[in-house]
Swiss-Prot record:
Zn(2+) binds at residues 168, 172, 178. Belongs to the endoribonuclease YbeY family. It comes from Psychrobacter arcticus (strain DSM 17307 / VKM B-2377 / 273-4). The keyword Metal-binding applies. HAMAP family: Endoribonucl_YbeY. This is Endoribonuclease YbeY. One of its GO terms (molecular function) is RNA endonuclease activity. Single strand-specific metallo-endoribonuclease involved in late-stage 70S ribosome quality control and in maturation of the 3' terminus of the 16S rRNA. It is found in: Cytoplasm.
Length: 206
């Protein structure tokens, strides 16, 4: 994929995302960090905070609407709906290279290869969360090299793939897991498709 194509697509998606997002109106918090092996040019070129925060907010807005209608969040099922709705959400994103990505995947999942994204839920009890000003969702680790390779293989812009991975990862942090069975996979994919559609991002599974 050429840099020009990447930038053109990136600008189109940014326009759609900006319609959904105003940083001054955001209470949710997002922290982005990276391995020492990830250049600043990579962070600046691919991982724009405003873009990622907007996708985070769109995902949580979508989930909030379904929580109101009775959706259970597996990892936050001991937190009442009102508390979930009122708490400011916090998310950490860490960008890494393929070597560290492989090490982390081996440690976390006993898989000896780098994967596109790993999710580390906060796992805090409701009693502790109730005392905190923010509700920590956990941490997502994105392997940049794998993300870029997959985007090229799937013939999609890197920014589209990043947005999809972020939605996918947040759903994992909430306790949704496509590996539990076909019904869980179908539910999670439906959520992803609908969230991305709200940002004018095409179905990632087509």
């Amino acid at each position: 994929m050429s840099q020009a194509n990447h930038n053109d697509t990136h600008n189109n998606i940014d326009d759609n995302i900006n319609n959904h997002f105003n940083d001054s109106e955001s209470l949710d918090t997002l922290d982005i960090s990276a391995s020492d092996n990830i250049d600043d040019e990579v962070l600046d070129g691919f991982y724009h905070r405003e873009q990622l925060l907007s996708v985070m907010m769109a995902t949580l807005d979508y989930i909030d609407e379904r929580v109101k209608k009775g959706l259970i969040l597996p990892y936050f099922d001991d937190i009442d709906t009102e508390q979930w709705q009122e708490k400011i959400k916090a998310l950490d994103i860490y960008i890494t290279d393929e070597d560290e990505g492989r090490e982390l995947n081996l440690e976390a999942r006993q898989k000896d290869y780098a994967t596109n994204i790993l999710s580390y839920p906060s796992d805090l009890p409701a009693a502790i969360i109730g005392l905190m000003p923010t509700l920590p969702l956990g941490e997502l680790v994105i392997c940049h090299a794998v993300m870029v390779r997959e985007a090229a293989e799937q013939n999609k812009a890197a920014v589209q793939h990043i947005n999809h991975l972020l939605v996918h990862g947040i759903l994992h942090l909430l306790g949704f897991d496509h590996e539990l069975g076909q019904a869980e996979q179908d539910e999670m994919e439906r959520f992803e498709i609908e969230i991305l559609a709200g940002l004018n991002i095409p179905n990632p599974y087509n």
